[in-house]
Swiss-Prot record:
One of its GO terms (cellular component) is cytoplasm. Gene3D superfamilies: 3.90.20.20, Head domain of nucleotide exchange factor GrpE. GO terms for molecular function: adenyl-nucleotide exchange factor activity; protein homodimerization activity; protein-folding chaperone binding; unfolded protein binding. One of its GO terms (biological process) is protein folding. This is Protein GrpE. It comes from Bacteroides fragilis (strain ATCC 25285 / DSM 2151 / CCUG 4856 / JCM 11019 / LMG 10263 / NCTC 9343 / Onslow / VPI 2553 / EN-2). Its main location: cytoplasm.
Length: 195
């Protein structure tokens, strides 16, 4: 081949390569511009819708978990309350059991005892032990001896003439002992008052 023809052929090949490069570059530029072009209104709405749906699912999941947690809490508190009602007096009952044991021993002893004073002392010990146990649970005896009548703590069931002037308006006798539990009256003392 002639050098001129060779040169022309090479130039043509170069031109073809340049054209191919240009076409490839244009298609790549078009793809890049398509990627960087702003989204259409429809595409924006679709994107916002997907984001909103994802947020809704997330909030729904949180709500369901919180609802289940609250339901479990409510069930647990109902169960605990039922147990408290059922077993609330267990501590008090357990503390009274030794008094019952002492009473059983006293009853057994009374069948064969000949000394009345010993039996009396035993019963007094049991009574004092019982009062001690009650006081540990917050139960206190309402004082009545030589006290003025206080309707918050005392219930006057009878009024009799006072033997002395000093005893007017005061309690002369206690028919039934009253008690408080942690400062609250659980039974008023039934008393006789002088007038």
């Amino acid at each position: 081949m002639d050098p001129k023809e060779k040169k022309t052929k090479q130039e043509e090949e170069l031109k073809v390569d340049d054209i191919q490069d240009t076409v490839e570059g244009q298609s790549q530029n078009e793809e890049a511009t398509e990627a960087t072009e702003p989204l259409t209104a429809e595409e924006k709405l679709e994107k916002e819708l997907k984001e909103a749906q994802a947020q809704i699912e997330d909030q729904k999941d949180k709500y369901l978990r919180l609802s289940a947690e609250f339901d479990n809490y409510r069930k647990r508190t109902v169960k605990e309350k039922a147990e408290l009602i059922l077993n609330g007096g267990e501590k008090s009952i357990k503390s009274i059991l030794p008094v019952i044991d002492d009473m059983e021993r006293a009853l057994t002893t009374m069948e064969t005892a000949t000394d009345v004073n010993a039996v009396k002392e035993g019963v007094e010990l049991i009574y004092n032990k019982f009062l001690s146990i009650l006081s540990q649970d917050g139960v206190k005896v309402i004082e009545t001896k030589d006290q003025p009548l206080d309707t918050d703590y005392h219930e006057a069931i009878a009024v009799i003439p006072a033997p002395t002037e000093e005893q007017k308006g005061k309690i002369l006798d206690c028919v039934q002992t009253g008690y408080t539990l942690n400062g609250k009256v659980i039974r008023h003392a039934k008393v006789v008052v002088g007038e």
